[in-house]
């Protein structure tokens, strides 16, 4: 479509985001509720956005700025560090580590090749293909059996077994506070809105019911800290689109069901893994094929 081509070339919008944040934090030994995790994501996101802008600026010097650059905040001399919600500094005090003022001058002089650069996508399919954790989300279990049109897909978290005790699992989180804070640190620097998710485990509430006050608190906190939008509200009900293998000793799980939804218990023994319901061979294959995660990821050194 010619009109779409004209608009696309005029703005050259990009949406670059994260895949495997849970793995990144597990390698650092941080849980989603740890302040060090929030500080790490703050540091990572600042460098992430800075170098996206720097690369786009260098492309603008080489190929010219995008036609509609003048319609962006960047053309007005504004950077993400200028207009984020300052309440986020209550979580992690603001600290500039990058040469933002030098970059501001370069952008004012040469512009940017792209009108937008960063966005956080769900990345469900990409994560499966690359055997990474899903976007910025905590995994629901160490081993998941995901349904698809071509049959069940077994996926184990990266770095297992070395990192199995360092992962934050979704339904183990005491609250959404850590996740909300992490998304807030990202939104501080990202130039497009992030649609975050809220997750509730009724087993952690009185009478196994999630009170409206808890949901209202999360919504207002997210708004206060700079969230623009939210997407899923997940509730743990022992069913869903994924069949999950839960770590032993965490909570009761449904082992058998009359329908297609089945959740199985993952049990750790001294001599390795054993999975009830006859899944042991499948788990052993995943265990063997999942390489040791001894190296330090490049992002960890930022």
What are the roles of these predicted feature ranges?
Residues 7-29, 189:
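Core structural elements
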Residues 21-30, 154-162:
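Short, compositionally biased low-complexity segments
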